């Protein structure tokens, strides 16, 4: 099956073609992403109405571009996958509307994909994918979750943030230190120049049982340290380093605790913060020390993209699942409510 995937949940327009007849990363025939960062920069954050309108402008040209790169005509497609949630309702409706219209015109099945399932499955696009069961850390601007993956499509939430997501904390700390939008990646780049230990911030919630996270208190602690400093460039890089180390340590401690909880040695990390170099190195070292394995998508597939939607959609379409003809999106959507790809009774 040749499946086209459409991602439009927030401020990236993504389109990709996945071919189930091929294996490994070669199965991704083409993928294109258009980022709206420049559009939203002057507002310091994503403006939902502007995001929706820009998806309208960019989606059809991106579809044509991606099909051309895949050397396919639209008539050769066997199915359509699209992000149905969670996300911004207007942005989701743009992608869902185009996807449903395309599927109807081609008389092929369509499937609405959970955005975070797309992220979770993105490391499986690589040539040496992880095998289930595994623990997944989903870490982005909107989510920080630990999920036990007993089988593809069978997910148990182990823990999540009680307030700010890790990526959101990165962006907010960057903003309070005067870095331009989007600040998270710039903060991480500054942290590489900082001196470890110059600023030592709390590792939140690691001193209590459980697998939940909280980053709002850490954000406030960094704010106070910054305000009480001379706010020089030298201090900025050291504060950035201290903050990043605190977040990375917290995520690593909770990931190891999650692996122990489910007696598993494979960790999958996905989402925008999964591209962070310090986090990757720390989690890889932790898993190696345990005799396990940490798996990541390549950095280009950590941010929102159509490839993960095409892949996740292909798995569900191959399992015989499809969405009805109505254009429906789910801005808030619990991943544990997704139907399994294989009956749970068949796996016992």
Curated annotation (Swiss-Prot):
Locations listed in the record: Cytoplasm
Name of this chain's protein: tRNA N6-adenosine threonylcarbamoyltransferase
Stated family: Belongs to the KAE1 / TsaD family.
CDD domains cross-referenced by the UniProt entry: ASKHA_NBD_TsaD_bac
Protein role: Required for the formation of a threonylcarbamoyl group on adenosine at position 37 (t(6)A37) in tRNAs that read codons beginning with adenine. Is involved in the transfer of the threonylcarbamoyl moiety of threonylcarbamoyl-AMP (TC-AMP) to the N6 group of A37, together with TsaE and TsaB. TsaD likely plays a direct catalytic role in this reaction.
Cofactor-binding details, from the entry: Binds 1 Fe(2+) ion per subunit.
NCBIfam families found in the cross-reference section: gcp_kae1 (TIGR00329), T6A_TsaD_YgjD (TIGR03723)
Classification via InterPro entries: ATPase_NBD, Gcp-like_dom, KAE1/TsaD, TsaD
Location (main, coarse): cytoplasm
PANTHER family membership: TRNA N6-ADENOSINE THREONYLCARBAMOYLTRANSFERASE, TRNA N6-ADENOSINE THREONYLCARBAMOYLTRANSFERASE, MITOCHONDRIAL
């Amino acid at each position: 099956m040749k499946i086209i995937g459409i991602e439009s949940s927030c401020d990236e327009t993504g389109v990709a073609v996945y071919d189930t007849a091929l294996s490994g990363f070669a199965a991704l025939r083409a993928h294109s992403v258009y980022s709206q960062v420049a559009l939203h920069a002057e507002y310091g954050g994503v403006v939902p109405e502007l995001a929706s309108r820009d998806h309208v402008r960019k989606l059809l040209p991106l579809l044509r571009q991606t099909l051309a790169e895949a050397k396919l005509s639209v008539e050769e497609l066997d199915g359509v996958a699209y992000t149905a949630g969670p996300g911004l309702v207007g942005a989701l409706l743009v992608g869902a509307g185009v996807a449903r219209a395309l599927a109807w015109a081609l008389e092929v099945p369509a499937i609405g994909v959970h955005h975070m399932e797309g992220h979770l499955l993105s490391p499986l696009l690589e040539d040496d994918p992880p095998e289930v069961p595994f623990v997944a850390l989903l870490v982005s601007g909107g989510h920080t979750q630990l999920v036990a993956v007993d089988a593809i499509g069978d997910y148990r939430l182990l823990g999540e943030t009680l307030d700010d997501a890790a990526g959101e904390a990165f962006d907010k700390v960057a903003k309070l230190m005067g870095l331009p939008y989007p600040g998270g990646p710039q903060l991480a780049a500054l942290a590489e120049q900082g001196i470890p230990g110059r600023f030592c911030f709390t590792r939140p919630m690691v001193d209590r049982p459980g697998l939940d996270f909280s980053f709002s208190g850490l954000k406030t602690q960094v704010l106070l340290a910054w305000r009480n400093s001379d706010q020089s460039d030298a201090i900025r890089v050291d504060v950035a380093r201290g903050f990043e180390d605190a977040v990375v340590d917290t995520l690593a401690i909770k990931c190891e605790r999650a692996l122990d909880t489910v007696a598993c040695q494979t960790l999958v990390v996905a989402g925008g913060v999964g591209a962070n170099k310090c986090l990757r190195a720390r989690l890889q070292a932790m898993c190696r020390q345990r005799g396990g394995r940490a798996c990541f998508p390549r950095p280009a597939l950590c941010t929102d993209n159509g490839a993960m939607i095409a892949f996740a959609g292909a798995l569900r379409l191959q399992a015989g699942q499809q969405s009805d003809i109505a254009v429906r999106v789910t801005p808030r959507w619990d991943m544990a409510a997704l139907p399994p790809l294989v009956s749970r009774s068949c796996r016992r």
